[in-house]
């Protein structure tokens, strides 16, 4: 990135050599005043953009931290959830087997 060669103060304090048929001093001064205003605008715009850039970088950093925290929270919950589903399925299978065994055992006793 190219650096700025002149500050508004440098432009304001610039002295030009005068010659017999030189430029109109008033016209040069007005032009330089316009350039100074432009430079001041550029400098303030650059500063605003730097501040916005810093703010946005901080927001991205915070968002990444929140995302990582959410991931660490979701991961254990997901594993607990999947283990509960497996446990529930296993318990259900056990209850079905017990029910069949009871029917076999107690069903025969009732008929006898």
Swiss-Prot record:
Write out the coiled-coil annotation as residue ranges. Answer: 32-75
Broad class of the protein's primary localization: cytoplasm
Keyword list (alphabetical) reads: Cell cycle, Cell division, Cell shape, Coiled coil, Cytoplasm
The keyword Oxidoreductase belongs to this UniProt entry's keyword annotation: no
- InterPro entries, per database record: Cell_cycle_GpsB, DivIVA_domain, DivIVA_fam
Tell where it localizes.
Cytoplasm
Keyword Transcription listed? The answer is no
Residues making up the signal peptide according to the UniProt record: none
What does UniProt give as GO cellular component? cytoplasm
GO BP annotations listed: cell division; regulation of cell shape
Q: What does the UniProt function comment say about this protein?
A: Divisome component that associates with the complex late in its assembly, after the Z-ring is formed, and is dependent on DivIC and PBP2B for its recruitment to the divisome. Together with EzrA, is a key component of the system that regulates PBP1 localization during cell cycle progression. Its main role could be the removal of PBP1 from the cell pole after pole maturation is completed. Also contributes to the recruitment of PBP1 to the division complex. Not essential for septum formation.
Q: How does it assemble?
A: Forms polymers through the coiled coil domains. Interacts with PBP1, MreC and EzrA.
- Which protein family is it in? Belongs to the GpsB family.
Q: What is this protein called?
A: Cell cycle protein GpsB
Species: Streptococcus mutans serotype c (strain ATCC 700610 / UA159)
């Amino acid at each position: 990135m190219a650096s700025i060669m002149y500050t508004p103060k440098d432009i304001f304090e610039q002295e030009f050599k005068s010659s017999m048929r030189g430029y109109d001093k008033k016209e040069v001064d007005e032009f330089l005043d316009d350039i100074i205003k432009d430079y001041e605008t550029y400098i303030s715009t650059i500063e605003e953009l730097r501040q916005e850039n810093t703010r946005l970088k901080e927001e991205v950093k915070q968002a990444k931290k929140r995302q990582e925290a959410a991931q660490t929270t979701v991961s254990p919950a997901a594993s607990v959830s999947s283990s509960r589903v497996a446990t529930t399925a296993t318990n259900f299978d056990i209850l079905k087997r017990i029910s069949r065994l009871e029917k076999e055992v107690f069903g025969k006793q009732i008929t006898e």
